[in-house]
Curated annotation (Swiss-Prot):
Domain Protein kinase: 803-1074
Protein name: Tyrosine-sulfated glycopeptide receptor 1
Name of the coding gene: PSY1R
Binding site for ATP: 809-817, 831
Known tissue expression: Expressed ubiquitously, including in the shoot apical meristem and in the elongation zone of the root meristem.
Note: PSYR1 and PSKR1 mediate a signaling pathway by two distinct ligands, which redundantly contribute to cellular proliferation and plant growth.
One of the record's GO molecular function terms: protein serine kinase activity
Length: 1095
């Protein structure tokens, strides 16, 4: 052992002074440093718990992100990985995973169950899917915060005891957020996890598909709860009084469900409650005065229920209220005077009730924070309340549909933020004064004053409007006021106006051409006036209707509040409509206009609706109308138009309504595309029209351009007709003889040598041998289930009776479909393609070969094809029961034959066929034109998707939509109007519309009013929002005992038609959901909702 003294002495010189190190000493120091580094490196590698690391690697292997992939590497300490945190214990266990908004897709693997110390898991706002692992919630028994919101997790919650790690039955979980997923099933009181979540403070499962009753037992198991959100699900039954046991509850949200019964009075004993959100249910009863005990309440929203009675008189005790929305109920009485004590109100909506009395008793001046005030569609009387002019923060106010009197006061100018103001359908007077004052509202963008100021004269002087008047006005409506005078010249100064409604007045004079100079005007209604003269050509220079780019550039920054701007349709009930949904439109119907329809109308290529009915227009229908490729409605009825209906109008693929009744038109009605679907009544009143839906033959002599004298016969003409008839018959006989001979010369094994030319009109004639023509043999694929080995064009023509009109069984975007009956009795469906498709013709053979390989039990099989000169023919399986459209809309007895099990099976079959196209078939196929007429039914009503793949076949998300292939009106996804790209999610939207057709029995365009577009979808959303989902169902399906299943399907359909394509499910999800819905009768008879009338 070395003596301490000697040791001190030996190292003393080294400490006291620096001497050059010997080589041996340098080597020693380097080795020492290296060993220390290796030691710390080994320690570093050992920081991450190996079991946790493996679990995380397994997790990363199950997820992916094209946007922001995880860069987790086993060579790096997992505690340093992005989104991962570890504790400070010797084991260095993972305690936190935070990977929100990373674009992750894939499943959540069961490996996360091995993270035994995990206290926080946040995977929100990703694209994760699939079920949650069994035992997931109870296995993670250290979890404090769980956030899986905004994903696509499906299935039931794994709420039972884990089969993995044990638990003492107590879970420290504090926050659970599973909102905005696809979860379903009931939340039962037998849940081990929820029964043991004593410290739970926040539980959010909104925007899923949970069923059963609200799990009120949670208030007993988790007395610390402060937030419960069950909104946007399918919960049913009553609200339980057990919810009152959540004594600390500050937020209770259960809106947009199927809850019924009364609001339990016990809920009004929750002293901390700040938000009570229960709209769009079927709640009934009265609002008990005990609600005034909720003195901390800031939000009370009970709209779209069946609540009746009066608003509690002491409502003013809720002095902290910022949002009070009780609209669309059956409330009666007057607005309590005490409401003025709710001085913090920002939103007050009492629209569509049965409230009455005068408004002057309410001191609105105390609402200094009020921004939105909606008292429309009640029965308020008396003077217009002047105290509203003191609400300095007001941006929108509606008093429409009441019985208010008086005049607009100059005090309205004190509302400097006012943007939306409508008081239509009241008894206001002094239009000139109102316009003089309101033009000073600098931010006013929407002004609707319809059905007021009766029989007054509109100020017409151009100088009436100041140079700075109405600087922001975009929506202007003074319809149905019976105003007199001419169209006021000062309107030319409204340079930002987009929507103008002057209908149902008594305006005289001519339509001023300067209307066509308003740069943003896309919606003009001059209907039901006494206007005379001709249509000015300048009117058809509206920039917003000439260019899609100009139309898209309109600002549309007005407030999105529902309005009624259609007073001229007195035969229908008033309906609320979003201003942004108004289609590009010109209504000039029922006036006294004369002259011709200017050819300049063809410049308005953005126009969706053109209605000129009920005038005295003469001349012909301009062929230039065919340039309006977005046109949906064209009504020229009740005029003096003559000549023929332009055949070019058949190219308007969006056209869903066409009416030329009661004119003097002549000649054949165009056939093909939508013209085969327009009703006969839309062509009546034109004695010289023939063909088409009139089913009358067109006699060439009947429409001769040479006018015959009375009782006289032109002998030259008769001689010419006789000679022509003689030579025509002779030529036909010769051709028939040649065809018979050619048929006899063709042996069955040499049928490919038969050469026949198919003309555009469907007739055929022999072609000289040796001519360079394409094959005339019909090529049948190996998947053909028919015993037909050889089939020639001649036999196909014979089977269709030369494509006779009597054999037409369908009409698609590419041409007509004929029934072909072969000699052996076999029936086929023959689609004869029409038009010039350019690139598609060059690739026709290759594309149909690809289509023939698409084999699925729910796809109409392509049996064969033929290419011959300009003719393109496809051979399909014949479906005995025709199309779904026929059974739903055309056959009067059809809907009754489609009971609920049949309709559900049709949805299941069609969705399966579409899923095959989207996910299995190679290349994937975007259908582009899913509609009820493209879903065919066999003899057992099994569904088959038809017309698939006739558009260009390329990979998903890269399919450009052309005017020929964009789809059918009513089924077209909204995003197709912004980016002309067909997508898989676009198909899902269209299929959602088909589902709504099956549920409602209505056409996609059947319920819309002249100023609304694609309204089956909007109508269904409105009915759901107003708490009346059962009322959308086909009356033939109601009270069938299947209401629960139908409501589930309705929810699925509504997800499919979501305006945001990214929020739509994929078609496989739809298939899975539909498979889980049973059609048997529901034993729980649902209470029928009361009729609600929205005036």
């Amino acid at each position: 052992m070395i003596d301490e003294k000697m040791r001190s002495k030996s190292i003393g010189p080294f400490v006291r002074q620096v001497k050059p190190l010997s080589p041996h000493m340098v080597l020693f120091v380097l080795l020492y440093v290296l060993s220390i580094s290796v030691f710390f490196l080994t320690v570093s590698e050992a920081v991450c718990n190996l079991q946790d690391r493996d679990s995380l690697l397994w997790f990363s292997g199950n997820v992916s992100s094209p946007v922001s992939p995880l860069h987790w590497n086993s060579s790096i300490d997992c505690c340093s990985w992005e989104g991962i945190s570890c504790d400070k214990s010797p084991e260095n266990r993972v305690t936190s995973i935070i990977l929100s908004s990373r674009g992750l897709s894939g499943n959540l693997p069961s490996s996360v169950l091995d993270l035994q110390r995990l206290s926080r898991l946040d995977l929100s706002h990703n694209r994760l899917s699939g079920p949650l692992p069994p035992g997931f919630l109870s296995a993670l028994d250290q979890l404090l915060v769980l956030d899986l919101s905004y994903n696509s997790f499906k299935g039931e919650l794994p709420l039972q005891q884990s089969f993995g790690n044990g638990s003492n039955g107590i879970f420290p979980i504090q926050t659970v957020d599973l909102s905005s997923n696809l979860l379903e099933g009931e939340i039962l009181s037998s849940s081990v996890f929820l029964q043991g979540a004593f410290n739970l403070t926040s539980f959010n499962v909104s925007n899923n598909s949970f069923t059963g009753s609200i799990p009120s037992f949670m208030c007993t198991a988790s007395p610390q709860l402060t937030k419960l959100d069950f909104s946007y699900n399918d919960f049913s039954g009553d609200l339980s009084q057990e919810l009152s046991r959540c004594s600390r509850l500050s937020v209770l949200r259960a809106g947009f469900n199927n809850l019924s019964g009364e609001i339990p009075k016990e809920i009004y004993n929750l002293p901390e409650l700040e938000q009570l959100f229960l709209p769009v249910n079927r709640l009934s009863g009265k609002i008990d005065n005990g609600i005034t005990r909720l003195t901390k309440l800031t939000l009370l929203e009970l709209y779209s229920n069946h609540i009746e009675g009066e608003i509690p008189k002491d409502i003013g005790k809720l002095s902290k209220l910022s949002s009070l929305q009780l609209h669309v109920n059956n409330l009666m009485g007057s607005i309590p005077v005490s409401l003025a004590n709710c001085t913090k109100l920002v939103k007050l909506n009492l629209r569509v009730n049965q409230l009455g009395g005068t408004l002057s008793a309410i001191d609105f001046s105390r609402f200094q924070s009020l921004s939105i005030l909606d008292l429309g569609n009640n029965s308020f009387t008396g003077e217009f309340p002047s105290t509203v002019y003191s609400c300095k923060m007001m941006t929108a106010m509606r008093f429409a549909g009441n019985k208010l009197t008086g005049q607009i006061s100059p005090q309205v100018l004190e509302l400097e933020s006012l943007s939306f103001f409508t008081f239509s359908d009241n008894k206001m007077t002094n239009l000139t004064g109102a316009l003089s004052i309101l033009q000073g509202c600098k931010k006013l963008s929407t002004l609707i004053m319809a059905k007021n100021f009766y029989d007054e004269t509109v100020p017409s002087n151009k100088d009436f409007l100041r140079s700075d008047g109405f600087p922001s006005l975009q929506i202007f409506g003074i319809g149905a006021c019976r105003l007199t005078g001419e169209i006021p010249a000062w309107l030319i100064k409204l340079q930002r106006v987009e929507v103008m409604d002057l209908s149902m007045n008594r305006f005289v004079g001519t339509i001023p051409g300067w209307l066509g100079t308003l740069p943003d005007l896309f919606y003009l209604d001059l209907s039901d006036n006494f206007l005379t003269g001709e249509l000015p050509k300048e009117l058809f220079q509206l920039r917003a209707l000439m260019s899609q780019k100009a139309y898209d550039a309109t600002e549309r920054n007005y407030l999105e509040l529902p309005v009624f701007v259609n007073p001229n349709n007195v035969t229908t009930n008033q309906q609320y409509n979003q201003l942004s949904s108004l289609p590009p439109t010109i209504y000039i119907k029922r006036n006294n206009l004369t002259g011709t329809i200017p050819v300049e109308v063809g410049q308005l290529k953005v126009l969706h609706i053109l209605e000129l009915l009920g005038n005295n227009f003469s001349g012909s229908i301009p062929d230039e109308l065919s340039n309006l490729t977005n046109l949906e409605r064209l009504d020229l009825s009740n005029n003096n138009l003559s000549g023929r209906i332009p055949w070019s109008l058949t190219g308007l693929h969006f056209l869903s309504y066409f009416n030329v009744a009661n004119n003097t038109l002549s000649g054949p009605i165009p056939t093909g595309t939508q013209f085969d679907t327009f009703p006969k009544a839309n062509f009546e009143g034109n004695p010289l029209l023939c063909g088409g839906v009139l089913l009358t033959s067109c006699d060439p002599t009947q429409h001769s351009t040479t006018k015959m004298g009375k009782g006289k016969v032109n002998r030259t003409l008769v001689l010419g007709l006789v000679l022509g008839l003689f030579f025509g018959v002779s030529l036909i006989l010769v051709l028939l003889a040649l065809l018979v001979l050619s048929k006899r010369r063709v042996n069955p094994g040499d049928s490919e040598n038969a050469e026949l030319e198919i003309n555009s009109n469907g007739s055929y004639s022999e072609v000289p041998p040796g001519s360079d023509k394409d094959i005339s043999l019909v090529l049948l694929f190996g998947n053909s289930r028919y015993e037909v080995k050889d089939l020639t064009i001649f036999e196909l023509l014979k089977a269709t009776d030369n494509f006779s009109q009597a054999n037409i069984i369908g009409c698609g975007g590419f041409g007509l479909v004929y029934k072909a009956t072969l000699d052996n009795g076999t029936k086929l469906a023959v689609k004869k393609l029409t038009g010039d498709y350019g690139m598609m013709e060059k690739e026709f053979k290759a594309e149909v070969e690809v289509l023939s390989r698409a084999k699925h039990e729910n796809l109409v099989a392509l049996q064969g094809y033929c290419v011959h000169d300009s003719a393109r023919i496809l051979i399909y399986s014949f479906m005995e029961n025709g199309s779904l459209d026929y059974w739903l809309h055309e056959n009067p007895e059809g809907p009754a034959q489609l009971d609920w099990p049949k309709r559900l099976n049709i949805m299941r079959g069609a969705s399966s066929g579409l899923a095959y196209m989207h996910q299995i078939c190679e290349p994937h196929i975007v259908h582009r034109d899913i509609k009820s007429s493209n879903i065919l039914l066999d003899g057992n009503f099994k569904a088959y998707v038809a017309d698939f793949g006739l558009s260009r076949l390329i990979l998903p998300y890269r399919t450009h939509v052309t005017t020929e292939l964009v789809g059918t009106l009513g089924y077209i996804p909204p995003e197709y109007g912004q980016a002309w790209v067909a997508t898989l999610r676009g198909d899902v939207y269209s299929f959602g519309v088909v589902m709504l057709e099956l549920l409602t029995g209505k056409r996609p365009m059947e319920v819309f009013r002249p100023k609304m577009s694609r309204e089956l979808v909007a109508w269904v959303h409105t009915m759901k929002r107003d708490g009346k989902p059962e009322e959308v169902f086909d009356t033939l399906l109601r009270e069938s005992g299947n209401e629960e299943a139908m409501l589930r399907v309705l929810d699925i359909a509504c997800m499919c038609v979501n305006q945001n394509p990214m929020k739509r499910p994929n078609i496989q999800q739809v298939v899975d959901w539909l498979k889980n819905i049973e059609a048997e009768k529901n034993q729980n008879n649902r209470e029928e909702p009361e009729e609600e009338e929205e005036t």
